[in-house]
């Protein structure tokens, strides 16, 4: 039980650079799951249509609770491809949270990013390092890049993008420092609650 601890190890205003550094860290994983988690908040119709093209069949949800005329929670169920812009505009902002086969959508996802917060998460397993008494734990280990944010839990919006390494629930600053050094960086702040 519990959540991983996420350490910020790279920050930039260049989304492609953040993605590239995240991929360099993913290459260090002893194992990487076959699926990646993709999350994006969409604030414009253009952004919504771009993301729908990248993630065909994705489900979109309202950001925040919306109540219909019957007093029940509203659901977004319009076809993004065929609905007129003016109708979609009234439903924004929306978000999507999807899993995709690793390697199938990440680059197109980054290219389609708008100004909303977004994230890609790769779950995996860091290699064991018995000399340092560090052992990977698949439930917690991985890499995450948060676009327009500096919070592993997708908190407040920022201009920059942040790459996190996730380690076990007790934290592992020495491992995070080693991983950061691999990409020419350093741990940029306190550990955060991860996934």
Whereabouts are the PLM-identified features?
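Structured alpha/beta or helical-core interaction and ligand-binding surfaces enriched in interleaved
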Residues: 1-195
């Amino acid at each position: 039980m519990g959540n991983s601890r996420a350490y910020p190890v790279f920050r930039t205003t260049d989304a492609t650079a953040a993605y590239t550094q995240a991929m360099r860290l993913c290459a260090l994983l002893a194992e990487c799951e076959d699926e990646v988690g993709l999350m994006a908040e969409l604030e414009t119709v253009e952004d919504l249509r771009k993301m729908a093209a990248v993630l065909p069949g994705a489900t979109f949800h309202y950001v925040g609770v919306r109540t219909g005329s019957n007093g029940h929670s509203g659901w977004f169920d319009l076809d993004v491809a065929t609905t007129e812009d003016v109708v979609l505009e009234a439903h924004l902002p929306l978000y999507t949270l999807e899993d995709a086969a690793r390697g199938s959508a990440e680059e197109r996802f980054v290219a389609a990013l708008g100004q909303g917060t977004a994230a890609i998460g790769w779950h995996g397993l860091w290699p064991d390092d018995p000399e340092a008494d560090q052992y990977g734990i698949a439930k917690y280990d991985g890499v995450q890049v948060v676009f327009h944010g500096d919070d592993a839990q997708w908190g407040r919006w920022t201009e920059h993008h942040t790459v996190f390494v996730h380690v076990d629930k007790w934290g592992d600053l020495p491992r995070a420092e080693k991983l950061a050094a691999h990409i020419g960086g350093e741990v940029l702040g306190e550990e955060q609650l991860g996934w």
